[in-house]
Regions:
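Short beta-strand segments enriched in small/hydrophobic residues
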Residues: 3-26, 175-184
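Short catalytic helix/loop segments, enriched in acidic residues and glycine
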Residues: 25-41
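Cap/lid and interdomain-hinge subdomains that line or gate substrate/regulatory clefts
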Residues: 45-48, 104, 109-244
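Long, internal scaffold/assembly segments composed of regular secondary structure
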Residues: 231-232, 236-330
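Extended hydrophobic packing segments that form well-structured cores
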Residues: 379-508
Length: 508
């Protein structure tokens, strides 16, 4: 099943009645053929649905209102086949709440030089009509993506596909509930933020849930369920045979981890939550035999299922990871929540070890993860605990984070290169080693100047284009650190953005 089967993107063609009935028929036929071609290309993750040609203000308004009210519709593509006077789009655009992609293309690829007459030129006026439509969108400060290119070409289809994935991620976030088991880690600034503004701007609804409530679900988990999940662990992951010895402490720790996973999944499903956070200083009543350490293995596996996760109460990362996972569906290389841990200064190959105490998603593993039990001496409960151990794939990727700047949210994106790490025999955790682009000095320096977190959401498959589209839809700031970044220019960008986002509130 396609992960995006529940969604549609609507295609609306712009024209007018000035050119006569034959033109109206031709526009409709061409539009149908284009939409069928887009769907049959095999390049688009979301079905395109042709919603007809709009020839008047009332028709525009009707189709955009319908888009707003259709839960399956996650975005709208507009294309002007003929000249379509843009004042007729004003009322509809004022009401459109779904993401907008303006496709500047043409039914025919090339000009038929020997046969083109005035009728042909009047019919095929995308060069004319799309500029008119673009003007009114800009005049109205309508945020949208503009894709320019022939509709059958690979690059055009790729840009539409990127937009569709972002629209799906955006739609998913509009009813996103994040559950915080406990509060944020004390005295940490960057994981905090304005939850009211986050819901207004990005759709995130963040609720506190006392760990005592989670423990009630934990108590209800049957031993048979736990035994079955432990058997699944042993089937899916490499492990020492001794780990299956039920008389050992190590087996008991695996069993405890399985019960924690079942309890967290149960409460998330009961509440309809799409993500959660934990805090190693809030693990429930010590008098009840609940969590003996942070539920690291549970967090790893739940991330792989698609639940957002943030450590130490980091609800913004939990929400963002869920969006990353949705956008990443059907792409091959995987994604994870990660944390900057340790620097490795090695000249041009200077890098950052990405890890966490336990919670790294196995979707990015280079090989089959290994189930192990080791001591974790941090937080309110210091104990042996189960986890999946692996290193990440080698290759390029992109990592992102959202920070609260006080007057706005800032999305920070950094291109990275994951490289092969040396063995870590004394550090039994999942990890990745990457070089932030353009190098550690500039990449890390720019990230710090932007106020970036130590937590981020990483994907091998997503690129900065996805995040640019996301920021455009959300109406938030985005800064991109890449191979061309210099500290001098990046500082200027941050300063200009500071002024822009203060003045922009007066324009909206």
């Amino acid at each position: 099943m396609n992960a995006f089967d529940q969604y549609e993107v609507w295609f609306v063609t712009g024209a007018q009645l000035l050119y006569g009935g034959d033109a109206v028929i031709a526009v409709d036929a061409h539009s149908n053929e284009m939409v069928n071609g887009l769907n049959e290309s095999g390049k688009l993750p979301v079905k395109v649905v042709y919603k007809g040609t709009a020839n008047s203000s009332k028709e525009v308004e009707a189709v955009f209102k319908a888009a707003n009210n259709d839960e399956k519709c996650v975005g709208v593509i507009t294309w002007m086949h003929t000249f379509s006077p843009a004042k007729m789009w004003i009322h509809g655009l004022q009401q459109l709440k779904k993401p907008l992609l303006h496709l500047h293309t043409q039914f025919n690829k090339e000009i038929p030089w020997d046969t083109m007459d005035m009728d042909f030129m009047n019919l095929n006026q995308s060069a004319h009509g799309d500029r008119e439509f673009g003007h009114i969108c800009t005049r109205m400060r309508i945020r949208r993506k503009v894709v320019v290119g022939y509709w059958k070409e690979e690059e055009t289809l790729h840009k539409i596909a990127v937009s569709m994935r972002v629209c799906a991620g955006w739609a998913d976030s509009q009813d996103m509930l994040i559950i915080r088991f406990g509060d944020q880690m004390n005295n940490v600034a960057v994981t905090d933020g304005d939850k009211v503004e986050a819901e207004q701007r990005m759709g995130y609804h963040v609720d506190y849930c006392p760990v005592s409530e989670l423990m009630e679900y934990h108590k209800d988990i049957k031993n048979e369920e736990v035994d079955a999940l432990v058997a699944t662990y042993f089937k899916e992951y490499d492990h020492d045979a001794s780990l299956e010895d039920k008389s050992t402490e190590a087996y008991q720790k695996v069993w405890n981890a399985a019960k924690a996973e079942l309890a967290i999944r149960a409460i998330l499903k009961a509440k309809g939550a799409k993500g959660f956070t934990t805090n190693f200083d809030d693990l429930g009543d010590i008098e009840y035999n609940g969590f003996d350490q942070i539920p690291g293995l549970a967090s790893q596996r739940l991330m792989a299922e698609g639940y957002g996760f943030g450590a130490e109460g980091d609800w913004k990362s939990a929400a963002l990871y869920r969006t990353v996972w949705v956008m990443n569906q059907g792409l091959p290389k995987g994604c994870s929540f990660l944390e900057d841990y340790t620097l490795n200064f090695d000249g041009a190959n200077s890098s950052i070890l990405q890890s966490h105490m336990l919670e790294v998603c196995p979707l990015i593993a280079a090989n089959k993860p290994r189930l192990e039990v080791h001591f974790l001496g941090i937080g309110i409960r210091k104990s042996q605990t189960a986890r999946l151990v692996f290193t990440s794939k080698v290759g390029t990727g992109c990592t992102a984070t959202i920070v609260d700047m006080g007057n706005r949210f800032r999305l920070i994106v950094n291109d990275v290169e994951c490289i092969e790490p040396k063995p870590l025999p004394k550090l039994p955790v999942a990890s990745a080693l990457w070089i932030p682009m353009p190098n550690l000095e500039v990449g890390a320096g720019a990230w710090i100047l932007a106020g970036g977190t130590h937590h981020s959401c990483f994907s091998y498959d997503l690129t900065a284009e996805y995040w640019e589209d996301y920021a455009e839809i959300a109406g938030i700031e985005m800064v991109h650190i890449n191979k061309d970044t210099t500290i001098s220019c990046f500082k200027k960008e941050l300063r200009m953005n500071e002024v822009y986002y203060m003045l922009n509130k007066a324009l909206c």
